[in-house]
Curated annotation (Swiss-Prot):
Superkingdom of source: Eukaryota
Gene Ontology CC annotation, any one: membrane
Protein's name according to its UniProt entry: Cytochrome P450 monooxygenase cfoH
Species the sequence originates in: Aspergillus candidus
Function: Cytochrome P450 monooxygenase; part of the gene cluster that mediates the biosynthesis of chlorflavonin, a fungal flavonoid with acetolactate synthase inhibitory activity. Within the pathway, cfoH is responsible for the hydroxylation of the flavonoid skeleton at position C2'. The pathway begins with the PKS-NRPS hybrid synthetase cfoA that uses benzoic acid or p-hydroxybenzoic acid as a starter unit with four rounds of chain elongation using malonyl-CoA to form the chalcone skeleton.
Protein's pathway: Secondary metabolite biosynthesis; flavonoid biosynthesis
Lineage: Eukaryota, Fungi, Dikarya, Ascomycota, Pezizomycotina
Phenotype reported upon loss of the gene: Impairs the hydroxylation of the flavonoid skeleton at position C2'.
GO biological process, one term: flavonoid biosynthetic process
Keyword Kinase attributed: no
Main location per the UniProt record: membrane
PANTHER family per record: CYTOCHROME P450 (PTHR24305), P450, PUTATIVE (EUROFUNG)-RELATED (PTHR24305:SF232)
CDD domains assigned to the protein according to its UniProt record, in alphabetical order: CYP57A1-like
Cofactor requirement: heme
Originating gene: cfoH
Amino acid sequence: MDTTELTQVEGSMMAVTRLATHPVLTFFAILLVAILLWYMIPYFTSPIRSRRGPLLASLTNYWRMYHAAGGSMHLVSYALHARYGPVVRMAPNYLDLDYPSLISTCLDSHGVWKKTEWHGISGVKLGNKVLYNIFSECNPAEHAQIKKPVAKYFSSTGVSVMEPHINNVLAFFVKQLDDQFTELAGFGKPLKFDEWASFYAWDTIAQSTWSRRAGHLEHAFDFDGMVDTSARVMDYLVTVGMQPSLDRFLDKNPIFRIGPPSFVPVANAAFNHLTKRRSGEDDHDPSKPDFLDCYLDAMKKYPEVVDEPRLMSYILVNVAAGVDTTATTLRAIFYLALKDRRVWEKLEAQILDASFTKLPVSYSQARAVPYLEAVIRESMRLWPGSCFAQERYVPPGGLTLPDGSFVPEGVAVGFNAYVIHRNKNVWGDDAEEFRPERWLQGEDESTERFKDRLRLMNSSDLSFGAGSRKCLGVNFATMEVYKTVATLIAVFEFELADPAREWKVHNSMFPRQSGIDLRIKRREGVTVPLGLDLGKEF
C-alpha cells in the first residue's frame, strides 16, 4: 500500500471515529438500538410468538390503534380470521379468537377472567383518583360491588316501569316524523333516518333517566352538539384504548387534560335534575319512576357504595351506553329489511295483521310477532351494538383451545361479535347473508333440531356481551327496540329514497351507519298524535 492509499485509509478511519464520537449521532444510535431491543426482546420471548398474524401487530399495539382510528377494525378482524384461522395474533399480547364454544368460558359469569386495560380508560379522573364506572371497572370484585345496588332495576320486571317513558317519547317521535316528512298526497321529503335514530335514542334515554327529553327531536338537529361529542368520545376510547398507556398523558394528564371532549353538558343536566329531585322542585310524576328515582333508592339502601359521584357515574353510563347501541340497532333493522323487499313485506304484513290494541305498541304485543323478533335478532347478529373485541386476561391455569394448543396465564384473548356472528359452524354457510328465517323453525325441521340449533345460536350471540359483564341495559334496550319498530311500521309506510345507494359504516365503540335516507307515508286510518302526554323537554 503506497503512501497515498495509506493516507486515504487513515482519513476514512478518522472520519468514522469522529462520527462515532459525535454526541448527537451517538445519542440517536443508542436510541435506535434501544427501540429495536424494546420491540424485539418481547417479540422473541413472548409465549405466543408462534401464533400467526400480521408482523406489525405482533410488535406493537399501534397497529391496532391505526385500524381502530380508521373505523375498519371489524373488517380487518374478519379478513384476518379468513386468512389465518380461528386464532389471530392482533397485538403483542392479544389473541383474537373465533371459537364460539369458548364464550361461556372466557366471558364467564363468575368474574374469574379480568377485563383488559382498554376498557378502563372510560373512567373519570376526580382529583388524584380515577372513578371507574360499571363498564370501565376491570376488577371483577369491584365491578360486582358497583353492579349490585342497581342490578334489580335492570331486570325484565325492573325496566317494565320505564315503558310509559318510552311511550311518551315514541309518540312524540311519530308526531315529528308525521309533521316533517309526510304529505297528504303521498310520500314526503327524504328522512335522514340515521340522524333521527340518534335524536330519538337521546330523547328516550333522557326521558327514562330524569323524566325530560333531551330536546333533539324538538329541535330536529344536534342542537347542543352532544351527538357529535358522543361520537368523538367513542372514537377516543377505541383508538387510545388500543394503547391504554397514552390515556395517562391525554385524558388523565395531571397537569393539563388533552383528552376527548367531555360529557360536561350531560353531567351538568344530570346534576341539575338530581338537585331539583332532592329538593322537591321538579314536577316529575312519582307514579312513573325513572332511573334517577332508582339510583336515589340505591343510594339509600347502599350508602357505603353509592355516593354522589357513583350515582352520577350510573347516569353517565346510561347515556353513553344507552344511546348509540339503540340507534345502531334501529338503523340496521330498517336498512337491512328495506334492502330486501321480501323481508320487508313479510315483516310489514305480520305487524299489520297483529291488530295491536293501542299505539304506541305495547312491549308484550310487539314480542308476540314472531317475524319481528326474527328480523331484530338477525339485524343485531350482523350489526351488533359493538364490533370491537370483548377482551379478557387468561387466569391462572391457562386456557386450552379446541385445537389442543395452550394459551398461558396473562395473555389477553377476546371475541369480536362481528366475527363470531359470521361463524359458519354456528350460523350456516349463508352466515354473511341477512336471513331472518334462521331464527324460526323451518317447515321440514323437527322441533328438537330447531331447539338445538337455537340453543347454539343463543350461546354464540354476543349482541349484548356475555357472562357477568353482559350489558346491564339489555332488557331496557330490547323493550325500546321492539316497541319502536312495531309502532313505526304500524303508523307509516316506508321505502328507501334511493334503493341502489349503500350505507356507510364507521366502526367506533359502536358502529355508526350513515346514508340511510327513507321516505315515509302515514297509513290510512291512523291518527297522529297518538293520544299520549308527549312529555317535556329539559
